[in-house]
Amino acid sequence: MARKTPIKHYRNIGISAHIDAGKTTTTERILLYTGVNHKIGEVHDGAATMDWMEQEKERGITITSAATTAFWSGMAKQFEPHRINIIDTPGHVDFTIEVERSMRVLDGAVMVYCAVGGVQPQSETVWRQANKYHVPRIAFVNKMDRMGANFLRVVEQIKTRLAANPVPIQLAIGSEEKFTGVIDLVKMKAIHWNEKDQGLTFEYQDVPDDMQQLAEKWRQNMIESAAEASEELMDKYLGGEELTEEEIKQGLRQRALKNEIILVTCGSAFKNKGVQAMLDAVIEYLPAPIDVEAIKGVLDDKGTPVIRHSKDEEPFSALAFKIATDPFVGNLTFFRVYSGVVNSGDTVLNSVKGQKERIGRIVQMHANKREEIKEVRAGDIAAAIGLKDATTGDTLCDLAHPVILERMEFPEPVISVALEPKTKADQEKMGIALGRLAKEDPSFRVWTDEESSQTIIAGMGELHLDILVDRMKREFNVEANVGKPQVAYRETIRKTVEQEGKFIRQSGGRGQYGHVWLRIEPLEPGGKGYEFLNEIVGGVIPKEYIPAVDKGVQEQLKNGVLAAYPVVDVRVAVFDGSYHDVDSSEIAFKVAGAMAFKEGFMKAKPVLLEPIMKIEVETPEEYMGDVIGDLNRRRGVIDGMDDTSTGKTIRAQVPLSEMFGYATDLRSQTQGRASYSMEFLQYSEAPANVSKTIIESRNTK
């Protein structure tokens, strides 16, 4: 079967924003204008097509990145049909894992900002993730019809807060209730959309007289940015020649693809203005799969690097980036094809797990409606039904040409709670439900506490765990009692010590003999976490016993010493010891290693580390004193304050243990007018009084 859309007409994009910037409405409008969706879904009444999980409808926030396919030929039908695959990304900080995951499979992104709120803390996190994966992006300043909307202020914030180089290619005509359209700076024309048909048609008009000067200024700024793309354009520009419309677009595209500039558009999705022109910008300035670097992978045996180009002729390779459970068809594995072609019914290799998988049915999703297709090709995003072993981040590839595309890195959870099923019947169902949820979301962990036999779940924040418990109830009908949230503390040391460990047993028959000297030293935080060195010379301990010493130390690391929390940031070297020809064994050296580590650890100035969160609170000015006072009471350190159009943003670092129930407290302090966002920043040493309380409560259990 031949390719319907040439790969150069593909755009794999993400739409990314913080909560309430209007991302879901923007996506809805895209689906409307691309002709897929005929009735506009409004988030206000919970009917948005992209928000297809039930709690998203209730909370009005987007949780799962659903992938949707749409076609666009331009506002004035000026392009050949382009296929736009949209990955919807969540804006809430507890779901950064989803954002990270979708950034991995995108070629470009549209960053949606609120014209009133501007660049929010969450936008900065998403921006950093987009930088990490070198994703070219354009900005869409939404909500131009709202009170306090200011387009150029947001442009300035993109520059100062994100350290980016914004280049507006449009200006807003009016703002708030007087917002009527946009000026296209490339054509130097005003665009007005027809309100009667929800913006499906439009007309060009002359630039309003009172905006002529401003438009000229920003047009020059844009042309200068375009001219910097090449010497040829620069010479023409400096020689006083006018750049043609084509040359301006070509220059802007080249620089946007290299991430040197970020093109800024504006509008109001709710009022059906601007999304249409932003879609044109997606086609003109964001990359096709062939415009981005070929993906690098490794061949398993020797780690030899391999490259896969976005071509149908190359061997098949794809990355599974999301697992979702569909009530009707079971497991859906969303994957992005980087090279080659795969047909339904083909058998492929899951190279990370080393297992073969049969691709049953392939579907393309339109939010949560499914369209079954027979094949997918390089550049496509689709979902396979019924893959058994694939988890997020796995590579699927041609059996004859194995490759592992880079693994995604997932953060460690910072908060855990105990779960108790309400009835005996729930017990078994809970195990199945948690297994499914953990497969979908790698930042969510499940284990059984050995002492209490309780099931423990851990994740990236309170909201993250709330939603997972909620999903268990809705999707799997499992009712559970949830314990108090527990903070994931860590243990480490502050000085270097040397410690002997001796394990000798003589009780008739063969004895046990293991004897080691360990040097235990602190490592830089945030590095490897644990390093083991073998410094034995002259065979005082035979080589075959060294891994057993390492194993003994590692078991102790896992169980902790001070208060049974995992130990991090230590280097352990075994440098001396002795053995017995008959009595020495692996188990004896394992025990000796564990004993030496445990004793040495307590002499090496052990400390407890606690997770510190980065908090940003937006509050009206009159509550600022209360908010700061409250953060100080929570052992917070205030980093700084910014003015916003509606008050102040306070930036602080606060221990996670002090943040439980903060949402409720903040609401009551500010009569519901303040909002906050929180993300994990780092581990740092807990004060002595806090450590003492935690250690005592852990050791009395």
Curated annotation (Swiss-Prot):
Function in brief: Catalyzes the GTP-dependent ribosomal translocation step during translation elongation. During this step, the ribosome changes from the pre-translocational (PRE) to the post-translocational (POST) state as the newly formed A-site-bound peptidyl-tRNA and P-site-bound deacylated tRNA move to the P and E sites, respectively. Catalyzes the coordinated movement of the two tRNA molecules, the mRNA and conformational changes in the ribosome.
GO cellular component term of the entry, any: cytoplasm
Protein name from the UniProt record: Elongation factor G
A GO term for molecular function: GTP binding
Electron transport as UniProt keyword: no
Classification via Pfam families: EFG_C, EFG_III, EFG_IV, GTP_EFTU, GTP_EFTU_D2
PROSITE patterns attached to this UniProt entry: G_TR_1 (PS00301), G_TR_2 (PS51722)
Binding site for GTP: 17-24, 88-92, 142-145
Species of the source: Hamiltonella defensa subsp. Acyrthosiphon pisum (strain 5AT)
SUPFAM superfamilies, sorted: EF-G C-terminal domain-like (SSF54980), P-loop containing nucleoside triphosphate hydrolases (SSF52540), Ribosomal protein S5 domain 2-like (SSF54211), Translation proteins (SSF50447)
Top-level taxon: Bacteria
Subcellular locations according to the entry: Cytoplasm
Ion transport found in the keyword field: no
Domain tr-type G: 8-290
Alphabetical list of CDD domains matching this protein: EF-G (cd01886), EFG_III (cd16262), EFG_mtEFG1_IV (cd01434), EFG_mtEFG_C (cd03713), EFG_mtEFG_II (cd04088)
Family: Belongs to the TRAFAC class translation factor GTPase superfamily. Classic translation factor GTPase family. EF-G/EF-2 subfamily.
Stored InterPro entries: EFG_II, EFG_III, EFG_III/V, EFG_IV, EFG_V, EFG_V-like, EFTu-like_2, G_TR_CS
Listed GO biological process terms: ribosome disassembly
Cleavable signal peptide: none
HAMAP family: EF_G_EF_2_B
Keywords: Cytoplasm, Elongation factor, GTP-binding, Nucleotide-binding, Protein biosynthesis
